[in-house]
Amino acid sequence: EVKLVESGGGLVQPGGSLRLSCATSGFTFSAFYMEWVRQPPGKRLEWIAASRNKANDYTTEYSASVKGRFFVSRDTSQSILYLQMNALRAEDTAIYYCARDVYYGYDYWFDVWGAGTTVTVSS
């Protein structure tokens, strides 16, 4: 069974930092692109970060809203995806999800999601 389990969310003051984790199991972690997506209260899902697979040297990509503040990484020995979040702002308040990215031909989609972890940025 493929599983993704996020953790590390919580309440943090503006300007603070948090590190989210996504523990994965049931598939070959190194073979897949992995993504971070968030949903602010009352808003739509927003893609924020990607970690490409081993074949693509685990290179990363970020949305403009988090670039330079958030950093995605992997522990391939434990099959864990991380999201280091720095200089947090009130607008970063959201439920954060990790997702597995699959593709066939030119079509990409996220086929497995975790339950999410909540981040609240407030003083």
Swiss-Prot record:
Q: Which Pfam families match?
A: V-set
Look up the record and give one Gene Ontology term from the biological process aspect. Answer: immunoglobulin mediated immune response
Gene Ontology terms, MF aspect: antigen binding
Leftover remarks? This chain was isolated from a myeloma protein that binds phosphorylcholine.
Q: Which residues constitute the signal peptide according to the record?
A: none
Keywords recorded for this protein, A-Z:
Adaptive immunity, Hybridoma, Immunity, Immunoglobulin
Q: Which PROSITE patterns match?
A: IG_LIKE
What Gene Ontology terms describe where this protein resides (cellular component)? extracellular region; immunoglobulin complex
SMART domains for this protein: IG (SM00409), IGv (SM00406)
Where in this chain does the record put each Ig-like domain? 1-114
Q: Which organism is it from?
A: Mus musculus (Mouse)
Output this protein's name.
Ig heavy chain V region HPCG14
Q: Which domain of life is it from?
A: Eukaryota
